[in-house]
């Protein structure tokens, strides 16, 4: 069995795989272990730009931070970005290869597995330990053939597996026992133990169930992790479910929950800011009065633009601007605010051209080569420093002289501001993570005395909080044994 590799699989989506990998990675780093995260295949519309100029799932970028590393395409060699109900853009080693439906991708999996193994071998050679995250559940019978995301990968590289389940949803013992029962005998042997996630209450009441589980399966419970309130690491793909109650929120910000929304993690700093009341507005919901409307990124811009119109957002924005409100469009939202969006190659569906909302004098054409950059620059507001990343296939040209939103360090200009200073559009994702930019943009939107928020520092604190929890509640002797690292090693300086 492969030394120094441990795979975390879950009984369901959102069982806690990403969070557990993040926590263990940081705990290992604090013990002086050189560790890297790895997810063979990810399906997500939230992605991050890597140091080598590709894109990976955002969860792996957070895990890289937990390891003290810059994100790299080897950490997530296969990324699937859904762009229709039956198809997705297939990204291999950070670069888009093709749009495929489910049948075509199934036939492509052998090629995808080669990319997975190449990346895994590079990480294994470079690091003391590799923490692997599975996808969804390993017990999806219809997905087992040619599986590269869960047990198919674990069997190929011969690594141990921990199975995690979410007790907060109920049925945790059925999830664990049922998942185990649907695995092959060799896969069952590969599962070394269980972790129960999001437990609330008195552990004494759970202990009879834990004893039964261990006796019934012959496998140990390696830890019961408590439910953590106020943990705000980026969600893998689903929009955040938990609202944040704030007593001092005075700025109302809303955004449409587009069917193909991408990189909704852009809004996390707004959700966490104590003075901002942020809300996603779904279909059938009436948008409330707001100070700021933000149009998010989209993996299918023309279709989401049509959805906006069908759900009355064009009139909502028109009225909002008439009463002095502000509007921001990010990436696909920026393109929607222009005069037209052309897709001559059919990159996001049927080839054609759509009339934009018309509040910015720009026109966009979608081109096959995707732009992937991590960037820094200065906002037109107060010369505020801004950092972010670009992930887009659109080439946008200005149809009239307009104020540029950002001057980038490489000399390029990004985005435009309307002549009346009410509408801003730009390609930069992550624009609210920079404290200076966040303060300047909130002030522009109408908030006078802005409290400073350092989103990266909050994320770092959350990662350390997770590591503290697994240090306390996981069986580290067993974990160290799986990874062939010393259970008691501890780099004290790395904690400082």
Swiss-Prot record:
- Residue ranges of every copy of the GATase cobBQ-type domain listed in the record: 250-437
- Would I find Glycosyltransferase among this entry's keywords? no
Q: Which UniProt keywords apply?
A: Cobalamin biosynthesis, Glutamine amidotransferase
Q: Which GO terms describe its biological process?
A: cobalamin biosynthetic process
Pathway in which the depicted protein is active: Cofactor biosynthesis; adenosylcobalamin biosynthesis
InterPro entries documented for this protein: Class_I_gatase-like, CobQ/CobB/MinD/ParA_Nub-bd_dom, CobQ_GATase1, CobQ_N, CobQ_synth, GATase_3, P-loop_NTPase
A Pfam family assignment: CbiA
Which residues catalyse the reaction?
331 (nucleophile), 429
Which molecular function term from Gene Ontology is one that the record holds? ABC-type vitamin B12 transporter activity
Q: Which HAMAP family match?
A: CobQ
Q: Which family does it belong to?
A: Belongs to the CobB/CobQ family. CobQ subfamily.
Q: What's this chain's function?
A: Catalyzes amidations at positions B, D, E, and G on adenosylcobyrinic A,C-diamide. NH(2) groups are provided by glutamine, and one molecule of ATP is hydrogenolyzed for each amidation.
Spell out the protein name for this chain.
Answer: Cobyric acid synthase
> Gene name, please?
cobQ
